[in-house]
C-alpha cells in the first residue's frame, strides 16, 4: 500500500473512491478519523494471446498496434505475468493504464490479431483496490501490522433523514414544489426543521426554504452514517434540484465533496464521499418478503408498530392549517427509518466485511453481485484471472439453457405434535427389466449408465440402489416390491365438466393397494415388453455388417443415387473410339448434419474399406459424398435388389434420418415423398407395418408450372407409436433424437389405454415375506420404468459443491478424466480445490465455528453484544452461501409495416424459412435477426421506445403456465418463470408468472412511439404476386422520350462491356441515382472510371430495360409497357425508377409510387370501416367497384371529396360513395388487403407512418364508424387480430384502450378507459389468474437494451436462476449448476428413505429443512435421542462436508402445502413460512380471527377451539355483538375516482365525499362498512359514521372477511368451510393427530 500512515495506527475504513489530481488517479480511503490517499495504485487489465508464452516480439506488436491507434500514450507500463485462466497457468500481458478512464479506450487492443481475449477491464477502480489489498472495511484495522484487532462494529455517528415536500394533485416537481420540512433522528432523539411555526416541542424554525436547505447540509455533515428510506431516488435528488435553484452546492462529503447522483441500472445512487448513505428501501426488498414495501409496511412487519400515516396529497392541507400532526408524521418517518437502519446495519456490516467492499456498495448489491465480488477477491488471492461478463449472444445462450430444479416433498397435510427438524449440511432380486443392447435382464445386473425401458422409451440409469431388507413384500400382478414403493395407476377422471375419456396417472404406495384400493385404478403395462427385450438381445448378437448394410439401404432410398453412364470418347493412342463405363454412388446431405455424415463415412469404411470423396455445391450447404468404384457400385446394387431381406429397423433408421423430420408443432415424426416415389413410400410403410408401428398416410395433390403433382406423407403421431419408433428405430443424429424424446415427453398420458405401446390391467395384490437384497433405479427424465412389464416408480447445495469440488475451474479436467466419478457426463478435479468450493468452505467453516461459540455462550447465559454480533455474522454467511405461449399476439415491426401476429406461428414460419441459420443451445432454437424491431419501454424514463429484435427463440416446455387477465380485458399466457412488469411503490418491477397476484398493477402501453417514416408504396413491386388474370392488362407509363431510352440502352451496354465510347452525362448520373453504379471523372485524361455497385441488380436492370426497349410503345415523350412483360424483373429494380411512372389499365392510372399521406390515410380510414370491393360483369365489361356504404349524411360528402382528392373520382349513389377504377381496386385488394366485409384488415404500412397520418386514418375511421345507433368510444369485432391492430393504432397517437371479450359476440375495444397512467404507460389491474399445465413450444424475443417487448398489448420480460446458473455471472457454469441441483435431489431422496427405514415419518423436506415425527408415540427426550442417532448415522453416508444437523424440537406444527407451514417451539416462538397473512384492506375482525386461530392450533393444539373461535365470531356477528370499528374496511385509491370505469366500494365512498366538497386524491385510504340490501356491494358501502351495527351485511363479512384468512389453514386440518359456518358434520380432535 503506497501511502504514508503518519500517526494512524488503528482506525476503520468506511468508504473509498478515487479522485483525479494532476491527471493522476488517487485512491481515497475514508477512515472514521482521517483520510488516507494512495497515489501508487494503478489501473490495469490482462491481455491473453493465442499462444502460451509471450515473446519480446509480441510486446512490440502490442505497442505497434497501440501506437497506430493513438493509444500508447494511455499506457504507463506493460508487463508479462503468469496467471491461471480457468484450469491452466499461462503467460499473459498486464497493461497498466495512466488513468482508469483510459481503460475503456484501451479495450480496442482486443482487435489486435495476436490477441485472444482481454480480462478484468471492467472492474471499477475503487472496488479493484479493495480486491487487491488486505484492508477489511467496517473493521477496526491495525494499519501498522495489517490485521483486524476486534470484531466490534466501529462506533459511528448515525442519523435518519427524511423530507416532506409540497404535493399538489400530481407527483411533486422539484422545479416547482418546495421542500416544507426535514426531519432527523439519532440516538438522542429527533427534531423537525421547517420555516413555519407549529405547536410541537421537537421543532426548529428557520427563515425560509433556502435556509432550510443550508441547515440540512449543516446537520448531515455531523454524521458518519445517514439512513434514508428511498433517499437514492427521492430525498437526495430532490434536495439537489431545489438547492440548484438557490445556487447552493450540496457539499456533504467528508473532504468537502459534492453529493453525487449516479445512475445504477434501473435506479439512482446518491453517493456522499466519506460518509455512508444507507438507503433502507433496497435492503428491505432484498431481505424481507412482503407484498408492499412502504415505510409503514416495513415498520409494521419488523416491529408490529403502526406508525402515523398521512397521505401525501393531504400534506398541503396540514401545512396550510399549521396542524402539528404533520410535524409528528415527519418526525415518525425519521424515527422509524432510524429504527429500521439500526436493525439492518449490523447485518450489512458483516456483508461488507465478508465481501470486502464498502457498505455504500454492499447495500446496493444483489446477493448475486455479492457472491461475484467475494469470488473475485478469492480469485486474486489464488492468482486466477476473473472471467469476463458474457456478451449479449452468450447471455442469450445461457438464458435459453434449462435444467431440472431442486426437489421438494409434498407435505403431509394436517397438524402434528412432537416434530423434530433437521437441516441439510424398492424390488427384490430377479425382477426383470429391459436394458438397451442386452435385452431382458435381472435388476441386480443393471449398471449405472445403462439405458432401461421407461415410460418415455429408453432412459439412462443414473444410480442403482441396493439395500439389505427383511420384511414383507407386496406382490402386484407378479411384480414384487417393498411396501413403500410406488406404483403408478391410471384413473378415470370423474367430473361432469371434464371429458369422459380423460384420465390421470397417480402414484400409489404398494401397501395402500392392500387396504385402500377400491378397484377403479388400472396398472400400466408395456404391451411389447418381451418383444422389445428379445429384439435387443437379437440385435446385440447380430453381425454389425448386416446392420450397417440395412442402414445403407435406408440412406440410399432417402438421399442417394446410383449413377451409371456409358460415355463415348476417342482413344488417340489406339486411333479409335471407345466406350467409358462410369459407376458412381452418391449421397447428398446438408453440411450441418455432422452425425449423419460421420455415419455414412463409417459405413463405407467398414463395409468397403473406402474413403468417400466430398464435393460441395457452390453457394449452398449441400455436400455430396461419393464413390466411383465399379466393384462397390455392384455390391451396393445387389444389396438394394435384396432390400426386403435386411433388417427393417435399420433400413427405417437410415431412411428417416435422411428424409424424415420431427414436427415439433404437431409433435409427430414425418416423412414425405414426391410423385415419382410412390413405390418407395409404400415400401417404407410396409416396414413400419412389420414392426407394428401405427401411422397415418396422406396424399395431397397440387399444381406447379402447369404440372399436376402429388406428395405422399407418412406421419407417426401417437405417443405409444413414437415411443416404439424411438426404441425400435430411432434416428442416427443426436439432434433429431433429442427432439423426438422431447415431443414424447410433451405427449400426455390421458388416453394411455388407447396407445399401442401401453396396455392396462386390473390390480391383483398379495403379501409375502422376504429376506435379501432389494434394488431400485434412479433415472434421467421421468422417474418411471417397466419392471416385469409393469410401470413402476424409482425411488445440500453448498455442501454438495464442496464435497464434489464443483467449480468452473475444476470441471472436466484432463488430469482426472479416468479417475473421477462421472455425474451427468461430467467430472471434477481431485487434485486441486476449486475457487468456488474453497470460498464456500471458508464461509461454512467460519459459520460453523461461530455457531459453536454462540452455543457455548448460550449455555452459560452470555447473550450479550458479542453474541448478537456473532449471530449477525453467521446469518450473513448463510445468506451468501422462462416464455410466452404460442397463441399470444406479438407486435413486430418489419421494413414494410407493423404486423400483429401470433408469436408461435410467426417464429415457426421464420424458422422454417431459415432453418439453415438456426442455432441450437440444448433443445432451444435461436434465429438471429437483423431487420426486425418491436415496441419496448425504458424502465427508468417510462417512455416507449422502438428497439431492435436481436433473436427469435423457441424451445419445448412442459409445466405450469398462467393465463393472466387484466381489468382492461387484455390477457396473456406465460410460463411460471416468465416476467411481466408491475407498478409498485412508484417503481416498475419485474414479476414472474408464479408471483403475479390479484390486484397487481401490470404495465401496458398508453402511448407507443411512432416509427414516423415517410411511407411510399411501390405498386409495381407489390403486385408481383397478384392473380395474373387481374393484372394482365395493366400498363406502366414512363414519362421519358425515346431518345433517352436509346442513350441509356447504349450506356448500359458499354458499361457491361467495359468500353464506354460515348459518355452521356445524364445517363450515368441517372444510373448513379438508381444506386447501380458509381463513377469518378478523371479530367486530366478526359476519362470516366465507372464501378458497378451490385452486379446482380445491374444485370436485372439491363434485362428489364432491354424488355422495355423491345416491347415498349413510344409516343409523345413517354413509353407504355405491359406490366406482365416486365413483372419478373421488377423485384430487383430500384424504387427511383418508378418516380416518373404511372400504372393502371389504359383508362384510369395512378402514380406508380403511392405516397401514404394524410389524404390517403383518411380514405383508408373510411374504407376499412365500411368499404367493399366488388368485381362484376356489366354489358360484357368487367367493372371494378370501390364503395363506402352506410355513412351518416353529414360525412358522406366529405367521403366523396376524399375519393376525388386521392384518386380523382368518386360519386354519391344513394347510401354509398363509389368509383370504378381497376388499379385502385387492385391496390386495395392486394396491397392494403381491404374490402372483405367478413374479414377486416388495417393496412400494415399505416403503422410505419407519422402520427399525423395515423390521426387522419383514425379521423376517417371514426367518422365512417359512427351512425345513429352507436358512438365512437366502443368497437365490436369477432376478429381478435383486427382489434389488436386497432388498439395499437390508438396507442400510437396516445389514446389508451381497453380490450374485452364479449360472450358469443367476439371482442370489444373501448377508448380512453379511466386507468392510472405513468408517462407512456398505463397501469392495468390483474383481475383473474388461471393456472394450467402446458406442454409444447414456448417463444421469446431477445430485444436490444430493454429486454422487453409487446405481447397482447402487454409488456413482457424474461428471467434467471441461481449464481452458477445466473446468465450474466462471470463464474457461470450451467453444467455445474445442473449437477448441484441433481445431487441435491439425490441426497434429499436418500435421506428421506433412510429416515423412513430408521423409524421416522417424514412430514416435509426441501433444501431448506427436514421435518419429521416418530412413527409411534414416544417421549420428547427419546425423540431427540433418536434424532441425534439418525444424524450421526446419515452423516456417515453423506459425502464430505455435507451434513444433516439437528435444528430443534417443535411442540406442534401445521403443514398446508409446499413451502407453507407454521411451527411452535417449546418457548412459544412461532415459525411461519409461506402462509398468507391478512391484507391491509381486510377489516380488523379478519386480523383478530386469524391470529386467534393460529394461537389455538399451535399453542393449545386444539382444532375444536380454533373451529369454535371462528364459529363464535360468526355467531357474534350474526347477533351484532361485534364492535363497529372492527368491521371497517380500508382500501387505497390507486387513481382519481373520476377515472374509474367500473365502480368499487371505496370509489363510491370517495365520489360521495367529493360531492360533499371533501378533497380526495390518489393514494388516499378510504374506510367503509358494507350494509345489507339488494343493490351491488359498491352501492351498499357506507361511511362508518353513517352505519348502525344492525345495518351490516353479515353474510358479506362471513364470506369475504372472516373465512378467507383462516380457511386454508383449517382445510389443512380437515375442517371444511361448511363446518365453520355450522353447515356440516362435527369432527373429533383425535382424527387429525397422526
From Swiss-Prot:
InterPro entries: DNA-dir_DNA_pol_B, DNA-dir_DNA_pol_B_CS, DNA-dir_DNA_pol_B_exonuc, DNA-dir_DNA_pol_B_multi_dom, DNA/RNA_pol_sf, DNA_pol_B_thumb, DNA_pol_palm_dom_sf, DNA_pol_type-B. One of its GO terms (molecular function) is DNA binding. Residues 552-693, 1163-1295 form the DOD-type homing endonuclease domain. GO terms for biological process: DNA-templated DNA replication; intein-mediated protein splicing. It is an enzyme of class 2 (transferase). Keywords: Autocatalytic cleavage, DNA replication, DNA-binding, DNA-directed DNA polymerase, Nucleotidyltransferase, Protein splicing, Repeat, Transferase. The keyword Transferase applies. Its EC number is 2.7.7.7. SMART domains: HintC, HintN, POLBc. It holds the Pfam family Intein_splicing. It catalyses: DNA(n) + a 2'-deoxyribonucleoside 5'-triphosphate = DNA(n+1) + diphosphate. Gene3D superfamilies: DNA polymerase family B, C-terminal domain (1.10.132.60), DNA Polymerase, chain B, domain 1 (3.30.342.10), Hedgehog/Intein (Hint) domain (2.170.16.10), Helix hairpin bin (1.10.287.690), Homing endonucleases (3.10.28.10), Intein homing endonuclease, domain IV (1.10.10.1010), Palm domain of DNA polymerase (3.90.1600.10), Ribonuclease H-like superfamily/Ribonuclease H (3.30.420.10). Belongs to the DNA polymerase type-B family. PANTHER family: DNA POLYMERASE CATALYTIC SUBUNIT, DNA POLYMERASE DELTA CATALYTIC SUBUNIT. This is DNA polymerase. The lineage of its organism: Archaea, Methanobacteriati, Methanobacteriota, Methanomada group, Methanococci.
Amino acid at each position: 500500500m503506497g501511502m504514508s500512515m503518519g500517526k494512524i495506527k488503528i482506525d476503520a475504513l468506511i468508504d473509498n473512491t478515487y479522485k483525479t489530481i494532476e491527471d493522476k488517479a488517487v485512491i481515497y480511503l475514508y477512515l472514521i478519523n482521517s483520510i488516507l490517499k494512495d497515489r501508487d495504485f494503478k489501473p490495469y487489465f490482462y491481455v491473453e494471446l493465442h499462444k502460451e508464452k509471450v515473446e519480446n516480439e509480441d510486446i512490440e506488436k502490442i505497442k505497434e498496434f497501440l501506437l497506430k491507434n493513438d493509444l500508447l500514450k494511455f499506457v504507463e507500463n506493460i508487463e508479462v505475468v503468469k496467471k491461471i485462466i480457468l484450469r491452466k497457468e499461462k503467460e499473459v500481458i498486464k497493461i497498466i493504464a495512466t488513468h482508469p478512464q483510459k481503460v475503456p479506450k484501451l479495450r480496442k487492443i482486443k482487435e489486435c490479431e495476436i490477441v485472444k481475449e482481454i480480462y478484468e477491464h471492467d472492474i471499477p477502480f475503487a472496488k479493484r483496490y479493495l480486491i487487491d489489498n488486505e484492508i477489511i472495511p467496517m473493521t477496526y484495522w491495525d494499519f501498522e501490522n495489517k490485521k483486524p484487532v476486534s470484531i466490534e462494529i466501529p462506533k459511528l455517528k448515525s442519523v435518519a433523514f427524511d423530507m416532506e415536500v409540497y404535493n399538489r394533485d400530481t407527483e411533486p416537481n422539484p422545479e416547482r414544489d418546495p421542500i416544507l420540512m426535514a426531519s432527523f433522528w439519532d440516538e438522542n432523539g429527533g427534531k423537525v426543521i421547517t420555516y413555519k411555526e407549529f405547536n410541537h416541542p421537537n421543532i426548529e424554525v428557520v427563515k425560509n426554504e433556502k435556509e432550510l436547505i443550508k441547515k440540512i447540509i449543516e446537520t448531515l455533515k455531523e454524521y458518519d452514517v445517514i439512513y434514508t428510506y428511498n433517499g437514492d431516488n427521492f430525498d437526495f435528488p430532490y434536495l439537489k434540484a431545489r438547492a440548484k435553484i438557490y445556487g447552493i452546492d450540496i457539499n456533504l462529503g467528508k473532504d468537502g465533496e459534492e453529493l453525487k447522483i449516479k445512475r445504477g441500472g434501473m435506479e439512482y445512487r446518491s453517493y456522499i464521499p466519506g460518509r455512508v448513505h444507507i438507503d433502507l428501501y433496497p435492503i428491505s426488498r432484498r431481505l424481507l418478503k412482503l407484498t408492499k414495501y412502504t415505510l409503514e409496511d416495513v415498520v409494521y412487519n419488523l416491529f408490529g408498530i403502526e406508525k402515523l400515516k398521512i397521505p401525501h396529497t393531504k400534506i398541503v392541507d396540514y401545512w396550510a392549517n399549521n396542524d402539528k400532526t404533520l410535524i409528528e408524521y415527519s418526525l415518525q418517518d425519521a424515527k422509524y427509518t432510524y429504527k429500521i437502519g439500526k436493525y439492518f446495519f449490523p447485518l450489512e456490516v458483516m456483508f461488507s466485511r465478508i465481501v470486502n467492499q464498502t457498505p455504500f456498495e454492499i447495500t446496493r448489491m444483489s446477493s448475486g453481485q455479492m457472491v461475484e465480488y467475494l469470488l473475485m477477491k478469492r480469485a486474486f488471492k489464488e492468482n486466477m484471472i476473473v472471467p469476463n461478463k458474457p456478451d449479449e449472444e452468450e447471455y442469450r445462450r445461457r438464458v435459453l439453457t434449462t435444467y431440472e430444479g431442486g426437489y421438494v416433498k409434498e407435505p403431509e397435510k394436517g397438524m402434528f405434535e412432537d416434530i423434530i427438524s433437521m437441516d441439510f449440511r424398492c424390488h427384490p432380486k430377479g425382477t426383470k427389466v429391459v436394458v438397451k443392447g442386452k435385452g431382458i435382464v435381472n435388476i441386480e445386473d443393471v449398471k449405472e449408465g445403462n439405458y432401461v425401458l421407461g415410460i418415455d422409451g429408453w432412459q439412462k440409469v443414473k444410480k442403482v440402489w441396493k439395500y439389505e431388507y427383511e420384511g414383507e413384500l407386496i406382490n402386484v400382478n407378479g411384480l414384487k416390491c417393498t411396501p413403500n414403493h410406488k406404483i403408478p395407476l391410471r384413473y378415470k377422471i370423474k367430473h361432469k365438466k371434464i371429458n369422459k375419456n380423460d384420465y390421470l396417472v397417480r402414484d400409489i404406495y404398494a401397501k395402500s393397494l392392500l387396504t385402500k384400493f377400491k378397484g377403479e385404478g388400472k396398472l400400466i403395462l408395456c404391451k411389447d415388453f418381451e418383444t422389445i427385450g428379445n429384439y435387443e438381445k437379437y440385435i446385440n448378437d447380430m453381425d454389425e455388417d448386416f446392420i450397417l448394410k440395412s442402414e445403407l439401404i435406408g440412406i440410399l432410398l432417402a438421399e442417394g443415387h446410383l449413377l451409371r453412364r456409358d460415355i463415348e470418347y476417342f482413344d488417340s493412342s489406339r486411333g479409335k473410339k471407345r466406350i467409358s463405363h462410369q459407376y458412381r454412388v452418391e449421397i447428398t446431405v446438408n453440411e450441418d448434419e455432422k452425425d449423419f455424415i460421420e455415419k455414412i463415412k463409417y459405413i463405407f469404411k467398414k463395409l468397403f474399406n473406402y474413403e468417400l470423396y466430398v464435393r460441395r455445391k457452390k453457394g449452398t450447404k449441400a455436400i455430396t459424398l461419393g464413390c466411383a468404384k465399379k466393384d462397390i457400385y455392384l455390391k451396393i446394387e445387389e444389396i438394394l435388389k435384396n432390400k426386403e431381406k435386411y433388417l427393417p429397423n435399420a433400413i427405417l433408421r437410415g431412411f428417416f434420418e435422411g428424409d424424415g423430420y420431427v414436427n415439433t408443432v404437431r409433435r409427430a415424426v414425418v416423412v414425405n415423398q414426391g410423385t415419382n416415389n410412390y413405390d418407395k413410400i409404400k415400401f417404407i410403410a410396409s416396414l413400419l407395418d412389420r414392426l407394428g408401428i401405427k401411422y397415418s398416410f396422406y396424399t395431397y395433390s397440387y399444381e406447379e408450372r402447369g404440372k399436376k403433382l402429388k406428395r405422399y406423407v407418412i406421419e407417426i403421431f401417437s405417443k405409444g407409436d413414437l415411443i416404439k419408433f424411438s426404441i425400435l428405430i430411432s434416428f442416427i443424429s443426436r439432434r433429431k433424437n433429442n427432439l423426438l424424446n422431447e415431443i414424447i415427453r410433451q405427449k400426455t398420458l390421458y388416453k394411455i389405454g388407447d396407445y399401442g405401446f401401453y396396455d392396462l390391467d386390473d390390480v391383483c395384490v398379495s403379501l409375502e415375506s422376504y429376506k435379501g437384497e432389494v434394488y431400485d433405479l434412479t433415472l434421467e427424465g421421468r422417474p418411471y420404468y417397466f419392471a416385469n412389464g409393469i410401470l413402476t416408480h424409482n425411488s445440500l447445495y453448498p455442501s454438495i459443491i464442496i464435497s464434489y469440488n464443483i467449480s468452473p475451474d475444476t470441471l472436466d479436467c484432463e488430469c482426472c478424466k479416468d479417475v473421477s466419478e462421472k455425474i451427468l457426463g461430467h467430472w471434477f478435479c481431485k487434485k486441486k480445490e476449486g475457487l468456488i468450493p474453497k470460498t464456500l468452505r471458508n464461509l461454512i467453516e467460519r459459520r460453523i465455528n461461530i455457531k459453536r461459540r454462540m452455543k457455548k455462550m448460550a449455555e452459560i447465559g452470555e447473550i450479550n453484544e458479542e453474541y448478537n454480533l456473532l449471530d449477525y455474522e453467521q446469518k450473513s454467511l448463510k445468506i451468501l452461501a422462462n416464455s410466452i405461449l404460442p397463441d399470444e399476439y406479438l407486435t413486430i415491426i418489419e421494413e414494410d409495416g407493423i404486423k400483429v401476429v401470433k408469436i408461435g406461428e410467426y417464429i415457426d414460419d421464420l424458422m422454417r424459412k431459415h432453418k439453415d441459420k438456426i442455432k441450437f443451445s440444448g433443445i432451444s432454437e435461436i434465429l438471429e435477426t437483423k431487420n426486425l424491431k418491436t415496441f419496448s419501454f425504458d424502465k427508468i424514463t417510462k417512455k416507449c421506445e422502438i428497439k431492435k429484435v436481436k433473436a427469435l427463440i423457441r424451445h419445448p416446455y412442459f409445466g405450469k403456465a398462467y393465463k393472466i387477465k387484466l381489468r382492461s380485458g387484455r390477457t396473456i399466457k406465460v410460463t411460471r418463470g416468465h416476467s411481466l412488469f408491475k407498478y409498485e411503490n412508484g417503481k416498475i418491477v419485474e414479476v414472474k408468472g408464479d408471483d403475479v397476484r390479484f390486484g397487481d398493477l401490470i404495465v401496458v402501453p398508453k402511448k407507443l412511439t411512432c416509427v414516423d417514416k415517410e411511407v411510399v408504396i411501390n405498386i409495381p413491386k407489390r403486385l408481383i404476386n397478384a392473380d395474373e388474370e387481374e393484372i394482365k392488362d395493366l400498363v406502366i407509363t414512363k414519362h421519358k422520350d425515346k431518345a433517352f431510352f436509346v442513350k441509356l440502352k447504349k450506356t448500359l451496354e458499354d458499361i457491361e462491356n467495359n468500353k464506354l465510347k460515348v459518355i452521356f452525362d445524364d445517363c450515368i448520373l441517372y444510373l448513379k441515382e438508381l444506386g447501380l453504379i458509381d463513377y469518378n471523372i478523371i479530367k486530366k485524361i478526359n476519362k470516366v472510371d465507372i464501378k458497378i455497385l451490385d452486379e446482380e441488380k445491374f444485370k436485372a436492370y439491363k434485362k428489364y430495360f432491354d424488355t422495355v426497349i423491345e416491347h415498349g410503345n413510344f409516343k409523345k415523350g413517354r413509353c407504355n409497357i405491359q406490366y406482365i412483360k416486365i413483372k419478373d424483373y421488377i423485384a430487383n429494380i430500384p424504387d427511383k425508377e418508378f418516380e416518373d411512372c404511372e400504372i393502371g389499365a389504359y383508362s384510369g392510372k395512378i402514380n406508380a409510387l403511392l405516397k401514404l399521406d394524410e389524404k390517403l390515410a383518411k380514405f383508408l380510414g373510411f374504407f376499412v370501416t365500411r368499404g367493399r370491393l366488388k368485381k362484376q360483369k356489366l354489358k360484357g365489361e368487367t367493372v371494378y367497384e370501390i364503395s363506402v356504404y352506410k355513412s351518416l349524411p353529414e360525412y358522406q360528402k366529405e367521403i366523396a371529396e376524399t375519393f376525388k382528392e386521392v384518386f380523382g373520382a368518386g360519386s354519391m349513389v344513394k347510401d354509398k360513395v363509389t368509383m370504378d377504377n381497376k388499379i385502385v381496386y387492385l391496390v386495395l385488394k392486394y396491397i392494403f388487403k381491404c374490402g372483405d366485409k367478413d374479414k377486416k384488415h388495417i393496412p400494415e404500412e399505416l403503422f410505419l407512418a407519422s402520427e399525423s397520418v395515423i390521426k387522419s386514418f383514425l379521423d376517417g375511421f371514426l367518422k365512417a364508424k359512427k351512425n345513429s345507433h352507436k358512438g365512437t368510444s366502443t368497437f365490436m369485432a369477432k376478429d381478435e387480430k383486427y382489434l389488436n391492430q386497432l388498439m395499437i393504432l390508438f396507442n400510437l397517437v396516445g389514446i389508451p384502450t381497453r380490450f374485452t371479450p364479449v360472450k358469443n359476440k367476439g371482442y370489444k375495444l373501448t377508448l380512453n378507459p379511466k386507468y392510472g397512467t405513468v408517462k407512456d404507460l398505463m397501469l392495468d389491474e390483474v383481475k383473474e389468474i388461471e393456472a394450467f399445465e402446458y406442454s409444447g413450444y414456448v417463444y421469446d424475443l431477445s430485444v436490444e437494451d430493454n429486454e422487453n417487448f409487446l405481447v397482447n398489448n402487454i409488456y413482457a420480460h424474461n428471467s434467471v436462476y441461481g449464481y452458477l446458473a445466473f446468465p450474466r455471472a462471470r463464474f457461470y457454469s450451467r453444467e455445474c449448476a445442473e449437477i448441484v441441483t441433481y445431487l441435491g435431489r439425490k441426497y434429499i431422496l436418500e435421506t428421506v428413505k433412510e429416515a423412513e427405514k430408521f423409524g421416522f415419518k417424514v412430514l416435509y423436506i426441501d433444501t431448506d429443512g427436514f421435518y419429521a415425527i416418530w412413527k409411534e408415540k414416544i417421549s420428547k427426550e427419546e425423540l431427540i435421542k433418536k434424532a441425534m442417532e439418525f444424524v450421526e448415522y446419515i452423516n456417515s453416508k453423506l459425502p464430505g462436508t455435507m451434513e444433516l444437523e439437528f435444528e430443534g424440537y417443535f411442540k406442534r406444527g401445521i403443514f398446508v402445502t409446499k413451502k407453507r407451514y407454521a411451527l411452535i417451539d417449546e418457548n412459544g416462538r412461532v415459525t411461519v413460512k409461506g402462509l398468507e397473512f391478512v391484507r391491509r384492506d381486510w377489516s380488523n375482525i379478519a386480523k383478530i380471527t386469524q391470529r386467534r386461530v393460529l394461537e389455538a392450533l399451535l399453542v393449545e393444539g386444539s382444532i375444536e377451539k380454533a373451529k369454535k373461535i371462528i364459529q363464535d365470531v360468526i355467531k357474534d356477528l350474526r347477533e351484532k355483538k361485534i364492535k363497529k370499528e372492527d368491521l371497517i374496511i380500508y382500501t387505497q385509491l390507486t387513481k382519481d375516482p373520476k377515472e374509474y370505469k367500473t365502480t368499487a366500494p371505496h370509489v363510491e365512498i370517495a365520489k360521495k365525499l367529493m360531492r360533499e366538497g371533501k378533497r380526495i386524491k390518489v393514494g388516499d385510504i378510504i374506510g367503509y362498512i358494507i350494509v345489507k340490501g339488494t343493490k351491488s356491494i359498491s352501492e351498499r358501502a357506507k361511511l362508518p359514521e353513517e352505519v348502525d351495527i344492525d345495518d351490516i351485511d353479515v353474510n358479506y363479512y362471513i364470506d369475504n372477511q372472516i373465512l378467507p384468512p383462516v380457511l386454508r389453514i383449517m382445510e389443512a386440518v380437515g375442517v371444511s368451510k361448511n363446518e365453520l359456518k355450522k353447515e356440516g358434520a362435527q369432527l373429533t380432535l383425535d382424527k387429525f393427530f397422526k
